[in-house]
């Protein structure tokens, strides 16, 4: 009865899409991680057990966010955002753990996690709050440059260490700025600035491996042979082997030796091989439903803070899913971006559920929230006309 009360009035389609994606993820992780578990003499369900543990944490966080007053998120983002930046800066210290050519992990001995997953959410909420407070002065140069500064602080520290994640964050924040009604000149400024930053990063000698990835992807030539190009080709073989209906659950061959990141970066390829076109179509359809419902929640929002937050959260999930599936289908160069809700990874799963919880909360309490709270708690947030 209590559970029924909590989920009343929330966006049911978004919730169901999330549930089905998680179920598919648990099944896929079980299958894709089997060779790795066997290689290290672990229990066959080792990775499933760990992922399930993080899922429980994520579900608890989801219900806590749905129940807590919205003002808690609004007020505490003032220190959560700076703390997430500090965690990113720690990647430059000995605590930063290099993996697959990029420093994504922070190893604190007792816990190992990706601070970028926390930054994705905190930067979205922080920028949403700033723009909601200053929506009618955004065309003022100072206000706009402050918003650009928030983007720079969010993307800059992580861009060298984890370029692809920086792009995901940048696109999500850019989507919020677009929704805020920036001028054509401001839009062009952001585009030129983004292209310039990408050029500077790729020109850095330390990022030579990224250039090789791009050249190998574009030319598909043996002159640019690399582990990334090899993985892309093996991923395509997995799609080909899967055909229309797949080879069957646990029967993938590619996951044994040809796809080293089978249960993380290339889990979509394992799904394609074991469940074929039908399986990949279902996954893509679920993400389309999720993204559509997320943007509809943003469209129906009655204050700017809700609107911008929903747009940012939805874009982050959507662009990350697109990048991962695009890499697996070899329409994008290898990025190291995982598939939300499906790929193995504790921090990513928990943060994806937190973002979903925020979307569900906006859908559940939108009208009630905007009727009673803007003056008392969010007095500096403008209600949409």
Give the predicted meaning of each segment.
Residues 53-58, 274-291:
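Hydrophobic alpha-helical transmembrane segments
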Residues 99, 103-105, 188-281, 302-305, ...:
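Hydrophobic, glycine- and aromatic-enriched re-entrant/interface helices and adjoining loop segments
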Residues 296-336, 342:
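Loop-to-helix entry and N-terminal half of a specific, functionally important transmembrane alpha helix
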Residues 60, 68, 97, 126, ...:
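Transmembrane alpha-helix boundary/anchor motif
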Residues 32, 145-177, 203-207, 272-279:
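Helix-loop-helix junctions and helix-breaking kinks within/between transmembrane helices
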């Amino acid at each position: 009865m209590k559970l029924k009360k909590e989920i009343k009035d929330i966006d049911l389609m978004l919730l169901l899409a999330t549930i089905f994606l998680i179920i598919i993820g648990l099944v896929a992780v079980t299958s894709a991680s089997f060779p790795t578990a066997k290689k290290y003499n672990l229990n066959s369900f080792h990775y499933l057990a760990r992922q399930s543990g993080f899922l429980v944490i994520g579900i608890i966080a989801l219900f806590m966010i749905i129940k807590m007053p919205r003002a808690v998120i609004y007020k505490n983002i003032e220190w959560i955002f700076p703390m997430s930046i500090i965690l990113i800066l720690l990647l430059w210290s000995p605590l930063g753990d290099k993996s697959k050519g990029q420093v994504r992990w922070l190893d604190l001995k007792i816990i190992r996690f990706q601070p970028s997953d926390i930054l994705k959410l905190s930067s979205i909420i922080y920028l949403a709050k700033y723009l909601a407070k200053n929506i009618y002065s955004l065309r003022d140069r100072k206000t706009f440059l402050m918003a650009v500064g928030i983007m720079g602080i969010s993307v800059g520290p992580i861009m060298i260490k984890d370029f692809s994640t920086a792009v995901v964050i940048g696109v999500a924040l850019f989507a919020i700025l677009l929704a805020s009604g920036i001028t054509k000149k401001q839009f062009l400024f952001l585009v030129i600035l983004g292209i310039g930053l990408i050029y500077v990063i790729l020109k850095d000698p330390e990022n030579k491996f990224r250039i090789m990835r791009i050249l190998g992807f574009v030319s598909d030539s043996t002159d640019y042979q690399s582990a990334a190009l090899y993985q892309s080709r093996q991923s395509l073989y997995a799609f080909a082997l899967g055909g229309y209906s797949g080879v069957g659950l646990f029967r993938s061959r590619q996951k044994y030796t040809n796809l080293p990141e089978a249960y993380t970066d290339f889990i979509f390829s394992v799904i394609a091989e074991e469940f074929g076109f039908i399986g990949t179509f279902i996954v893509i359809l679920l993400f389309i439903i999720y993204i559509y419902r997320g943007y509809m929640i943003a469209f129906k929002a009655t204050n700017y803070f809700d609107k911008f937050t929903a747009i940012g959260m939805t874009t982050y999930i959507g662009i990350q899913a697109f990048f991962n599936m695009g890499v697996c289908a070899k329409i994008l160069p290898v990025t190291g971006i995982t598939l939300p809700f499906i790929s193995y990874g504790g921090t990513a799963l928990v943060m994806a559920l937190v973002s979903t919880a925020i979307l569900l909360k906006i859908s559940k309490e939108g009208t009630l929230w905007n009727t009673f709270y803007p003056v008392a708690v969010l007095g500096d947030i403008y209600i949409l006309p």
